[in-house]
Amino acid sequence: MTAPPVDWVEAAEAADPASLADQAAVAALLGREPQGDFEVVVRRTGGAPVVIENAPVLPGGRPMPTRWWLVDAELCRRVGTLEAEGGVRRAEAEVGEAVMADAHRRYEMLRDRAMPQ
């Protein structure tokens, strides 16, 4: 069974620090206030946040462990279903160890580049 499509989402051309409306929307989607600063990097066509990019360090100086978060409720449900059905294992098997290792290295590079000096 295929899930119905969601309205198209688009990447933000240039992410800006979250507006007050973005902060309120993300807090509602998470069910709590975000721990640190973030930018909305993907939005639904109507402007609602879909993916946020977290600042690499939380206000208290602790590193933020997750750089990007999917916050859209419908897409989170769909991803959760895929994960519960073994989708992560299938995807990892399809792309192979070398591609996964390269993806992890690129993530580390982007994370490290964003860290304050």
PLM-predicted stretches and their roles:
Residues 57:
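Short, glycine-/Ser/Thr-/acidic-enriched flexible segments
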